[in-house]
């Protein structure tokens, strides 16, 4: 069951956290990358467009209801978690920018549940192209495609800023191109000026 975001605001993105944030209470939001239930403790890798942070859920911190929610998390659930940033008590994960810290969860809200995706949302996936294209909205969550989209956005923004600073005007002109109804028919629009014509 999806919960409300009322009164909740993200304080930072996952990969923006570092050892400098140890001791701070933060709210992070994103997709569940992995969830590992070890009995009395649940580890979750939370992913947003910036990267991944490890979350730890213990019943003593989240209460019985919060721990029960954490125990049912699956891949691609969307969650909002509030907790305290701490140094990792176990081994440091050298593969993550945030590998030396974790967030000890105090509160969790499940914003959206998800069925198991048809392929793993991860970099260098060996998934066939036709399946990736069928589920393009999931494929665009992969880190390598996210980086491409972010880079494209930054280049477009910098280009616009540069041209604006040089005194250029951005004018949106009509784009003349061939109609592509893709199997459907074009809509016929009656003419107001010439009755009976389209």
Predicted regions located by residue number:
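Class II aminoacyl-tRNA synthetase-like tRNA-binding/catalytic domains
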Residues: 3-198
